[in-house]
């Protein structure tokens, strides 16, 4: 996505830049929908039938699965905004938002120490809240500073086809790497 946004910036075509951003939002929404469908079908099946979870902790494991899926969806939806910041080379914004994210995660860790409720559920919910705050910060910053992020989302079929092909291969490569690194943990469980 950064590649397409950077190329459009270089061309100086504001309308094409807006279409590229809009298309990237649509593509990420489609990916997010696929993730939700996979988690709600295969993820729940795997959790309930294949995972070795102690008695009485299945409820907490379900919370973690749902909150983790929420974090993943929020992160997917942040990608076009992160790409705009990177393409515009506004690294100070990226640094400040990352600093906020790190601080919030530190507060989550400290808050767990004082939490009277189930720490696993609390952790999952607080990490979802952190992801939501970070997502809103990226969106607010981009909408304020970058013209292409304002306005309505429009659908350009040819651009969706072109960008989703590239993004799909990138997503497949990242997914294979994730399965490679995390698959050992699943198999050992």
Question: Model-derived features: where do they sit?
Answer:
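Helix-loop junctions and terminal segments of transmembrane helices
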Residues: 1-11, 87, 146-147
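Alpha-helical transmembrane segments of multi-pass membrane proteins
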Residues: 41-44, 54-78, 99, 125, ...
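Helix-terminus/linker motif at the lipid-water interface of multi-pass membrane proteins
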Residues: 48-52, 111-116, 178-189
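Membrane-interface junctions at transmembrane-helix termini in multi-pass inner-membrane proteins
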Residues: 73-98, 121, 142
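Interhelical loop/hinge segments that connect adjacent transmembrane helices in multipass membrane
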Residues: 120-126, 138-185
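Membrane-interface helix-loop junctions in multi-pass transport and translocation proteins
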Residues: 92, 103-136, 140, 144
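Alpha-helical transmembrane segments of multi-pass membrane transport and lipid-handling proteins
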Residues: 23-52, 111, 136
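Interfacial transmembrane-helix starts/ends
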Residues: 14-30, 164
């Amino acid at each position: 996505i950064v590649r397409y946004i950077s190329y459009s910036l270089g061309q100086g075509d504001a309308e094409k830049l807006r279409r590229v951003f809009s298309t990237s939002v649509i593509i990420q929404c489609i990916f997010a929908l696929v993730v939700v469908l996979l988690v709600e079908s295969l993820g729940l099946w795997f959790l309930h039938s294949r995972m070795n979870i102690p008695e009485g902790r299945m409820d907490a494991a379900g919370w973690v699965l749902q909150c983790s899926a929420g974090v993943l969806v929020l992160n997917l939806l942040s990608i076009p905004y992160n790409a705009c910041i990177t393409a515009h080379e506004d690294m100070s914004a990226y640094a400040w938002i990352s600093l906020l994210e790190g601080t919030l995660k530190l507060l989550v860790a400290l808050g767990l120490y004082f939490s009277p409720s189930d720490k696993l559920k609390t952790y999952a919910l607080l990490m979802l809240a952190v992801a939501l705050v970070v997502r809103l910060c990226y969106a607010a910053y981009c909408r304020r500073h970058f013209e292409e992020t304002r306005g309505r989302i429009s659908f350009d079929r040819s651009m969706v086809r072109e960008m989703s092909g590239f993004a799909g291969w990138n997503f497949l490569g990242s997914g294979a790497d994730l399965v490679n690194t995390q698959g050992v943990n699943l198999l050992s469980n």
